[in-house]
Amino acid sequence: METIKKLNWSPDIIHVHGWIASLLPLYLKEYYKDEPLFNNSKVVVSVYGNEISGNLDSKMVKKIQYDEIESETLQVLEKPTYLDLYKNAILNSDGVVIAGEEMDESILNLTQTHNKPTLKCGFKEGFKKEYLDFYTTKILN
């Protein structure tokens, strides 16, 4: 995000992949909310099935709060798991790509409950047109 600021580039879409980048939507919507370069940027997250199981450090929320991110936006991370990272990313994104063949039901329910534009593509080849349609009609609209 800091590199984008230094380049003075305002991206139309920021697409993040997997649990490793799942805090970026939160930071973009909360930490960088007053940054003019990101005012019109849309965030899409790709989620994958069969992720790592287990819990994350419970101090994670305190570390995020250090960046002055409000507690109510972190409720899903109170007892953080890798699945909860995805949930937080979805809640702070403008669209979701279901890229895994098998997806946890709670992820699918969350996208429906919050009316998130969703593209289910799995790992098939030749989905360029589907992405283009998704970006232009569902995300940038």
Show which residues each predicted segment covers.
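Catalytic cores of nucleotide-sugar-dependent glycosyltransferases that transfer UDP/GDP/TDP-activated
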Residues: 1-141
